[in-house]
UniProtKB/Swiss-Prot annotation:
InterPro entries: Hedgehog (IPR001657), Hedgehog_Hint (IPR001767), Hedgehog_sig/DD-Pept_Zn-bd_sf (IPR009045), Hedgehog_Signaling (IPR050387), Hedgehog_signalling_dom (IPR000320), Hint_dom_C (IPR003586), Hint_dom_N (IPR003587), Hint_dom_sf (IPR036844)
Subcellular location as annotated: Nucleus; Cytoplasm
Site-annotated residues for Involved in cholesterol transfer: 305
Recorded superkingdom: Eukaryota
Native species: Drosophila mojavensis (Fruit fly)
GO biological process: anatomical structure morphogenesis; cell fate specification; cell-cell signaling; intein-mediated protein splicing; protein autoprocessing; regulation of gene expression; segment polarity determination; self proteolysis
Record site feature (Cleavage), residues: 259-260
Lipid-acceptor residues (Cholesterol glycine ester): 259
Keyword Endoplasmic reticulum assigned: no
Gene3D superfamilies: 3.30.1380.10, Hedgehog/Intein (Hint) domain
Entry protein name: Protein hedgehog
Amino acid sequence: MDNNQAVSALWSCASATCLSLDAKRHSLEPSSPDGQASLDVNNKSAPVDAHARKLRHIAHTPRGSCFMALLLLLLLALNFRHAHSCGPGRGLGRRRERNLYPLVLKQTVPNLSEYHNGASGPLEGVIHRDSPKFKNLVLNYNKDILFRDEEGTGADRVMSKRCREKLNMLAYSVMNEWPGVRLLVTESWDEDHQHGQESLHYEGRAVTIATSDRDQSKYGMLARLAVEAGFDWVSYVSRRHIYCSVKSDSSPSISHVHGCFTPESTALLESGAEKALSELAIGDRVLSMDTKGQPVYSEVILFMDRNLEQVQNFVQLHTDGGAVLTVTPAHLIAVWQAERQTLEFVFADRVEELSQVLVHDATGELRPQRVLRVDSVQSRGVVAPLTREGTIVVNSVAASCYAVISSQSLAHWGLAPMRLWSTLQSWMPAKGQLRSAQDKPTPKDATAQQQNGIHWYANALYKVKDYVLPQSWRHD
């Protein structure tokens, strides 16, 4: 049964239920003066709009109101349609099954040196039990992982936070791929110097893994699952095990997991004034972009992140019109595809020279300008405002409010609960109305009261994404 048939059947069922309830009510009331009941449910010639009249009547009773609310929710759920967006994702709805191809012996992903910045990054130094950095390592007690622990010291459970995160993700994938089989860790942090002089095992950033059944035919796929889990470098190093490693927890490329702008970047208010992002407050209406690429003003409903002290790597885009946008690498930027006449959202670190971004010009329109130069810079402070529209124009350049996930429409859908909550809050009495006029906070006070750090909901979405989205949809 398709959605339309289901909706039709549900509506018919609801109508019949309402009619029967109404008939029962009228059977307990006096007849009309002409001796006929108010409603003859057996009358085949009754007007078609009788259903609507009865539904309206039922909706005015307490029980009927609950029934109608549930009915509406069911109708909305059954009549749900995929969202369309100019973003590059596949849209909302059911994810297509993807074919995962196992790695072959001696293959590495990515095909770079392990110590390259595009892989796990450079060595930072051996960590001993008495090293100051040892306290930054964590223990992994995941019951879905077997730790061989040949040394009997528990060292195989010791690892960096990022390594634990990716290992737990891999354990989940292994159980789904092979029911009854668990992930086996044969080596993690090494304090006995049993590896080469340069090894990330000494920093708790590397693991060697296998499956609990020791079935070597599974190891190629195990390596692929490790890639999907987000390990920064995976090697099918031998027929006996797989080697995986991660970036340092202090690496600038992962120290900030969400997309943000610099605090000194500016947004255009509806009043025509420009305001630094560090001074924006919830409720400000700023220039944004609608789904058709047209400029609109949209309300700031929350800050997904705000940290004025965080030192972070940024991508800096320079356009031929003089606009400069500084943004974190995983942030989505609106890019105009002239050949296809479409607008797509692309990760900032994947925007290339001669790409076209939308810039708010003197005419008040958003028009394409070519990117002349792409730089990498480091700066202090990150701010990530979320508008109701899901987009924002910063330093005159149109950008998404979202990052990490490649689909603008999917990210926007994921923040729907926060938009709903913001709407509900707008219906409630404002805090200022409960105080005297003298105590009402000023906009400057409201800005000062902004949260410091990642918003709890944005952080929750970040943690969930690895479980529900393939790596190709993520910026890892």
